[in-house]
Amino acid sequence: MKRTFQPSNLVRKRRHGFRSRMATPTGRAILRKRRAKGRHKLSA
């Protein structure tokens, strides 16, 4: 059986990267929350 996690850095960046987060209002909300929490890493 094929495993569900097939790592790809390109897909990872496109789906969870900083620019994709900034592209939508909800994505910006996520970044805002992570900044408020004090995360050192905001996105993938």
UniProtKB/Swiss-Prot annotation:
Record-annotated disulphide pairs: none
Gene Ontology terms for molecular function: structural constituent of ribosome
Keywords carried by this UniProt record: Ribonucleoprotein, Ribosomal protein
GO terms classed as biological process: translation
Cited InterPro entries: Ribosomal_bL34 (IPR000271), Ribosomal_bL34_CS (IPR020939)
GO CC annotation: ribonucleoprotein complex; ribosome
Region (Disordered): 1-44
One of the Pfam families matching this protein, by short name: Ribosomal_L34
Domain of life (superkingdom): Bacteria
Record protein name field: Large ribosomal subunit protein bL34
Organism: Rickettsia africae (strain ESF-5)
